[in-house]
Amino acid sequence: MEKRPLAGKVALVAGGTRGGGRGIAVQLGVAGATVYVSGRSSGSAGSDLGRAETIEETAALVDAAGGTGIAVRADHGDPDQVRALVDRIAADRDGRLDVLVDSVWGGDPLTDWEHPLWEQDLDRGLRLLRRAVETHVITSRFALPLMVARESGLVVEVTDGNTARYRGSFFYDLAKSAVIRLAFAQAAELRPHGVAALAITPGFLRSEAVLDHLGVTEENWRDGAVKDPHFAYSESPAYLGRAVAALAADPDVMAKSGRALATWGLYGEYGFTDVDGTQPDFAAHWADALVDEYGPLGDPL
């Protein structure tokens, strides 16, 4: 891959505040892109998640990586705010948007891992769907016209898992499966206009929240395997980011449109590594250590 294959390209990473979204934004910056980073957690106003990370921090990391980071606070559940965000990009960049990444989530505090549907709080579950699915629909509704007008671009829907395996909680499973279907449906409608759309999942992602939960940092993350042995096979957000940057730089990415992809299925093709030079493959670890307990991952959707 060229050193800066995305120089001159414009990207929007919705939900780029932390985790996979931040990792993707930074790696798009490494590849030379101008990256608009949007979300609710800003230096001027936080979100109900109560996390310390901000969109401004992510934008600064994009700058430090060699790209251009632009933070724009927006609640992607509010159509007016998303419309204003896209209008700003159009005005700033002469209508150009090459990459749309939708990594909006915010569902961790709403996920009930203990109860079946009939025992769950309905309002809480529906709020999860609004955050995790409706936000993606709203974002694409306003951003896609920029790509369609130029007859080029890539839409990336970030999810969890790329198969039909049940994900352990009704509303969580519904949200993550729906995001894959969003990519499939967008691919069908965008194909005549030369725009690709796909879904992508990381493996066991070392997000800030996961690191906090295990009481470690990115510097000593391996110590987290004491509490969770499977964490030894985790991957950093940069690994997901490098996968997306490789896809965005691939002139033949249209061949992957409509598919549900994974970091473990792409590192061999594109040759990217994690920050420590390794190439984590969580599907291989699953087959070795988890399949007897949880069943096979299944074939990609």
Tell what function each PLM region has:
Residues 199, 219-301:
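C-terminal helical subdomain
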